[in-house]
Amino acid sequence: MTINALLLSSSRVGDTPYLAHAIPFIKPLTTNAQKWIFIPYAGVSMSYDTYLASVVTGLSELELDISGIHQHPDPQQAIKDADGILIGGGNTFHLLHQLYRYDLVTLIGEQVALGKPYIGWSAGSNVSGLSIRTTNDMPIIEPPSFKALNLVPFQLNPHYSNYQAPGHNGETRAQRLLEFTKVDPLTPVVGIVEGSALWRQGDKLSLLGDQPAYLFCGEQQEIPIPVGSDLSHLLKA
């Protein structure tokens, strides 16, 4: 079996309905996977039931059987029994903290390595990389480790934008990622813009959507990655 992982920048693009833009990206991963487990642990400002309901509604046209991991007495068994794994956005630190709390980090990696499809957006994409050291989120809770699922051997930065509001004097996203590359010059970071996604199929990695991505690694800063690029070389990082 090979890894089949879709890493979405966001749950929306512009003013589109929740997950609507992602349906064409998600659909190919559901061909042989009907029963999905949704992990809502990144959702801090809403109940898990409310979060689950929004995902079920957003993906309703795919007619999937989606349950929340919080509805199962044994989270590990729920992962094993599912045909696919969905992890939504929110706070990445809280998400990873809960994944460690229920001892799911290694298990999810093992299940995806065996071919179980994985779909994440925002925080759910952040945790798919080597670590969560390039998340945009506030560290509201301290997980046991920043090490993440390692579904791809590099760092991700979802919602990438280097926009700076006039008169605002805080760091831009590019400046923050530059800081990471100064500390760790050998690990690539891919900034994925809202509306786009990375899709790993075994040894192949593709950029989906109509927006470029951006690469940061060592002295390479904010290098545009053209729409439709093959990024398979990053899997050898």
Curated annotation (Swiss-Prot):
Keyword tags: Cytoplasm, Dipeptidase, Hydrolase, Protease, Serine protease
One Gene Ontology CC term in the entry: cytoplasm
Annotated EC: 3.4.13.21
Top-level EC class: hydrolase
GO process annotations (BP): proteolysis
InterPro entries attached to this UniProt entry: Class_I_gatase-like, Peptidase_S51, Peptidase_S51_dipeptidase-E
Location(s), subcellular: Cytoplasm
Active site annotation, chain numbering: S122, D137, H159
MF terms (GO), sorted A to Z: dipeptidase activity; serine-type peptidase activity
Domain of life: Bacteria
Record bears the keyword Cytoplasm: yes
Reaction(s) this enzyme catalyzes, per UniProt: Dipeptidase E catalyzes the hydrolysis of dipeptides Asp-|-Xaa. It does not act on peptides with N-terminal Glu, Asn or Gln, nor does it cleave isoaspartyl peptides
Protease is among the record's keywords: yes
Entry's family note: Belongs to the peptidase S51 family.
Record function comment: Hydrolyzes dipeptides containing N-terminal aspartate residues. May play a role in allowing the cell to use peptide aspartate to spare carbon otherwise required for the synthesis of the aspartate family of amino acids.
Official protein name in the record: Peptidase E
Taxonomic path: Bacteria, Pseudomonadati, Pseudomonadota, Gammaproteobacteria, Alteromonadales
Gene it is expressed from: pepE
